[in-house]
Amino acid sequence: YSNSFLVMTGPMTDIVYSRFSNDRAEHLSIRTDILEKDGKHTVRKYPATPAAAAHIEALAENECVFTERFKGSTLSVNRLELKRNPDGLPFAEIEYLENSRTLEELLDECLQNNDEAGFDKLFDRYCKIAAWKAEGTKQDYDLTFPNICVQGDIWTMIDYEWTTDKLTPQQI
């Protein structure tokens, strides 16, 4: 048994949360940071290795594809800006949605309150969104309840990292 401690000295950092996804294949390993500056939050995704740079760059392409695909639907796509570190490696700066709840939280709340009508309304809207212009386009197979943030009537897709060019079946 041993204890471990990390002591950091120096100026305060803007990072309030950091998650390392280094249990993935090297070309998919990333670090996700949430930063806070002047009361405003931002999300950044960095390649954990140079091999993961293409994975980060693909996020910008995915944002464009899904913004076009969901145009006219009731789903917006979270904004992303691809930037570069001084070493030339890319990172994605993504809008942090303040005062939002995930679709998962809303569905869970309906279940806890025995609100079947509310659950059905949310789930039906989700199904319509998932099927929107699905034929022949890139699919996000992680368009799951926790990856949709809800602010009032605005639904926003917050994660478009895991995609495929194969059609996702509507009936399972």
Tell where the protein language model's regions lie, with residue ranges:
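ATP-binding glycine-rich loop module of kinase domains
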Residues: R19-R69
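Short, intrinsically disordered, charge-balanced linker/junction segments flanking boundaries
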Residues: Y1, K45, L82-R84, D124, ...
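Conserved structural core of kinase catalytic domains
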Residues: S76-F123
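Short acidic-glycine loop/turn motifs at beta-strand connectors
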Residues: T13, K37-G39, Q151-I154
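Core SAM-dependent methyltransferase catalytic element
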Residues: S2-D14
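Hydrophobic residues embedded in beta-strands of well-ordered beta-sheets
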Residues: H41-T42, P90-A92, I154-W155
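An alpha-helical support segment within catalytic cores of ATP-dependent transferases
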Residues: D115-Q139
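Catalytic activation segment of kinase domains across protein kinase-like and atypical kinase folds
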Residues: G136-I172
